[in-house]
Amino acid sequence: MAKITKEIVFGNHKLILETGEVARQADGAVMASMNGTQVLVTVVWKKDGGESNDFFPLTVNYQEKFYAIGKIPGGFNKREGRPSDNETLISRLIDRPIRPLFPDNFFNEVQIIATVLSLNPEVSPDIIAMIGASAALSISGVPFNGPIGAARVGYKDGVYLLNPSRKEQEESKLDLVIAGTKDAILMVESEAQELSEDIMRGAMLYGHEMMKNVIKSIEELARDVGKSKPEWKAPEIDTVLKARINDVARNEVEAAYLIKDKQQRYQRLDELREQTISALLAENDELNADVIANMFGELERSIVRNRILDGEPRIDGRDHRTVRPISIRTKFLERTHGSCLFTRGETQAIVVATLGNERDAQILDGISGESRDRFMLHYNFPPYSVGETGQVGSPKRREIGHGRLAKRALMAVLPDANEFPYVLRIVSEITESNGSSSMATVCGTSLALMDAGVPLKAPVAGVAMGLIKEGDRYAVLTDILGDEDHLGDMDFKVAGTEKGITALQMDIKISGITNEIMEQALEQALEGRTHILGVMNNALAEHRTELSQHAPRITTMKVAEDKIRTIIGKGGATIKGLIESTGVSIDIDDSGVVQLFSPDKMALEEAQKQIKALIAEIEVGQTYQGKVSKIVDFGAFINLLPGKDGLLHISQICADRTQKVEEVLQEGQEIEVFVAGIDKQGRVKLEWKDKPQAEAKEVEDAPVSATFLTMEEQSEEINSGNKISEEEE
């Protein structure tokens, strides 16, 4: 196949889609490029074998190569390893809008691989990868009801930005990624700075409109390639069997869905499913048990959906707008820095906040460069939370995705590092789950942080919305259950403060979501969020004024940049000595910000005192309590500050020159001295304030001699190591 190229004007960028030159043995391969960022996306699918599957085995792998930015991977193994969290999140970003566009009952294996080959740091590769995946699917011959487009939308000074650069993203109040077909929005992922529902809805509509030009070009590319799609037909539905299942099981299934307790309801439905399969196989042993089970599931779906559309109570007895009962316990765990047990219906999370110092920040080394993450949120979904057994270990894609959503919801309200210099780690342990565990994590995180004394700008709550739609009839549901998510048409999660939205995630399984439906969903989400915030405020309205007794303390100091060398010392000796003597962790950056970190408040104060002494300057006219550090023939060196000595001349010590200094002073003795002067070379002249009066008179009568060392004496002292060198200071 000859090379085919499409160029698309996409905001301020030119998007190029190419096929026919690279990876020609894949079913579909597209090189997608934008301003120096190039992503190769390939699609391969099995033409048979789907009959043996009872699910759709779609795999999306997004991978970043370090050579794309001219870097060699760090660490011992100099090659790319397991996917980073960012790669996992972008894989999910590609997967979510395309998965609903494959036909029902299409179970053939499909694999999509998106590889970043070249990166312009100012152009994010995620949108390019999503568009490339859509184009590769469209030319692969796989049954796919696309193409889709994708766009990133920012918001600054009242204006929406299409595909903003990295620099523009930093100044934007919104980071929204949207994907959809030319007729419908399918997926939204966003982080916002407390924006209103109207602004968020406007951003979605703007992004959807802007991506239509991309969709049109992908359709043209597919026509130019001209690959015919195989005739694929879904298995014919056995209407006779479907009617028979309805006759045998409907009444019992309807009764089962009146059971409000999830585990009891599931147990009863499992019994009914097995009874139905056994009864029908007894009537006709040629029937397939899996087919019967699938049709039984369709019956469940029909019953739940029709009840809701008819205005009947939901599975747990609620109306469409009611939030499940909420209970909250802060300070749930005794020895943690902050904790919360958040329960909403049959969804429950233990959320724990831990405070650390700058060394605890997560180092992220990706192709975009190294950075440090001061706020980590880890979401765990153990199998016991849904009454199942399963593997426990590394987080799965879903756990990484849910944790990222909850983290985004809190980013807008975190205090500035200068105001609260702690590194924060949140762990959310989902202990029960029946829908919306990520939003329970958002609420629990807000409460756990405030319980730990973190001064959030405002509390944050989240709620998951659902949709049931048949033709022109629809119902928007607040705070959906797991069954309502599974059997419904939309999962729409909204988090925010009383002021506005901080995070939004939407996945839609059908086309035809109107502006009216979206507006109602946002309005109900605001109502639900406001209710939840009220319950949260009753439990803990503001952050605690005192940190937990188990939490470490951080003190931050600012020193002059020319004092950094003094604190560190030669070869790091001074700062190491401070750390060893006080037990305090000490960090200092190039701008002179010193961070002291310790669970011991007294140790923290001592370290701060010693650092202040280290950088203090000796002042003329001031009195110091000094210690005799060395006695010489012509006087005594008195240590005034760490690393800083002054000379108390023999004339200030002895009554006459026949008396020895050792007869009056001993090394280690503490005396009060007065700084009489400092010469141009930095040498300090001292006077002894409290020496006996008789000695004072004799000194006054004594001939005035050089109070400072002669040049010969000074050289001798420096050479013999008796005076502190500048490096040691």
Curated annotation (Swiss-Prot):
One of its GO terms (cellular component) is cytosol. SUPFAM superfamilies: Eukaryotic type KH-domain (KH-domain type I), Nucleic acid-binding proteins, Ribonuclease PH domain 2-like, Ribosomal protein S5 domain 2-like. Mg(2+) binds at residues 485, 491. It is found in: Cytoplasm. The gene is pnp. Signal peptide: none annotated. The keyword GTP-binding does not apply. One of its GO terms (molecular function) is magnesium ion binding. Component of the RNA degradosome, which is a multiprotein complex involved in RNA processing and mRNA degradation. Keywords: Cytoplasm, Magnesium, Metal-binding, Nucleotidyltransferase, RNA-binding, Transferase. It holds the Pfam family S1. InterPro entries: ExoRNase_PH_dom1 (IPR001247), ExoRNase_PH_dom2 (IPR015847), ExoRNase_PH_dom2_sf (IPR036345), KH_dom (IPR004087), KH_dom_type_1 (IPR004088), KH_dom_type_1_sf (IPR036612), NA-bd_OB-fold (IPR012340), PNPase (IPR012162). Residues 621-689 form the S1 motif domain. One of its GO terms (biological process) is RNA processing. The keyword Metal-binding applies. It catalyses: RNA(n+1) + phosphate = RNA(n) + a ribonucleoside 5'-diphosphate. Gene3D superfamilies: GHMP Kinase, N-terminal domain, K Homology domain, type 1, Nucleic acid-binding proteins. Its cofactor is Mg(2+). Its EC number is 2.7.7.8. Its main location: cytoplasm. Residues 552-611 form the KH domain. This is Polyribonucleotide nucleotidyltransferase. SMART domains: KH, S1. HAMAP family: PNPase (MF_01595). Belongs to the polyribonucleotide nucleotidyltransferase family. Involved in mRNA degradation. Catalyzes the phosphorolysis of single-stranded polyribonucleotides processively in the 3'- to 5'-direction.
